Amino acid sequence: MRHYEIVFMVHPDQSEQVPGMIERYTGVITEANGKIHRLEDWGRRQLAYPIQDLHKAHYVLMNVEAPAETIEELETAFRFNDAVLRNMVMRTKVAVTEASPMAKAKDERDSRRGPAGDRSYDEANAEEIAE
């Protein structure tokens, strides 16, 4: 089996259907005795240029190990799913399991926020003023 990196972009109005799509696509891979090494839901992001008059899309990244027939089946599913705006499947030499730069940047932002990151600006300032 070969290793692949798959990225697909979903119409922003269909974002609530993304978990079901991920489940369906991962099911296709695991049924063919494939493995999912990395799965990242990047969420809704700004596009570099408009696609079908849209400026945002929901991104999903998957690194998988699967037979070529399974990847062809996934590409066909992407092609016939109107919610999928774009997809890209690239063959890789080895399995990629570490977090992507997108996920690392998100983790860094979350860690910098610290414990006050969940509170509103007014709550954090109210505590500082009270002290």
From Swiss-Prot:
Q: Which family, according to the similarity comment?
A: Belongs to the bacterial ribosomal protein bS6 family.
**CC annotations in GO:** cytosolic small ribosomal subunit
Q: How is this protein named in the record?
A: Small ribosomal subunit protein bS6
Pfam families given in the database record: Ribosomal_S6 (PF01250)
- In which organism is this protein found? Shewanella sp. (strain MR-4)
The record's annotation in PANTHER family points to: MITOCHONDRIAL 28S RIBOSOMAL PROTEIN S6, SMALL RIBOSOMAL SUBUNIT PROTEIN BS6M
- GO MF term set: small ribosomal subunit rRNA binding; structural constituent of ribosome
Q: Tell me, in a sentence or two, what this protein's role is.
A: Binds together with bS18 to 16S ribosomal RNA.
Basic and acidic residues composition-biased segments: 104-122
Q: Which UniProt keywords apply?
A: Ribonucleoprotein, Ribosomal protein, RNA-binding, rRNA-binding
Q: Where is this region: Disordered?
A: 96-131
Which Gene3D superfamilies does the annotation name?
3.30.70.60
Q: Which GO terms describe its biological process?
A: translation
**Can you tell which superkingdom this protein's organism belongs to?**
Bacteria
